[in-house]
Curated annotation (Swiss-Prot):
One Gene Ontology biological process: translation
Record organism: Anthoceros angustus
Keyword field contains Transferase: no
Protein name: Large ribosomal subunit protein bL33c
PROSITE patterns on file: RIBOSOMAL_L33
Cellular compartments per GO CC: chloroplast; ribonucleoprotein complex; ribosome
Similarity section: Belongs to the bacterial ribosomal protein bL33 family.
Domain of life: Eukaryota
Keyword annotations: Chloroplast, Plastid, Ribonucleoprotein, Ribosomal protein
GO molecular function, one term: structural constituent of ribosome
Signal peptide interval: none
Length: 65
């Protein structure tokens, strides 16, 4: 019997510092696409990723689609 594919979903991660302040060299918001397992991580995912607009590693938070 095959397992259900509904557990693993695609999510979008957005930079928290880019969306809050406008004092950057370039305008834009850094976004990453990833997958998460709903059973293991029911809450919103937060990862530290590189932001090309801030030129630093910043916290990227899961957003609603």
């Amino acid at each position: 019997m095959a397992k259900s594919k509904d557990i693993r979903i695609a999510i979008t991660l957005e930079c928290t510092s880019c969306s809050e302040n406008d004092e950057k060299r370039f305008s834009g918001v850094s976004r990453y696409v990833s997958e998460k397992n709903r059973r293991n991580t029911p809450t919103r995912l937060e990862l530290k990723k590189f932001c090309p607009y801030c030129y630093k590693h910043k916290i990227h938070r899961e957003i609603k689609k």
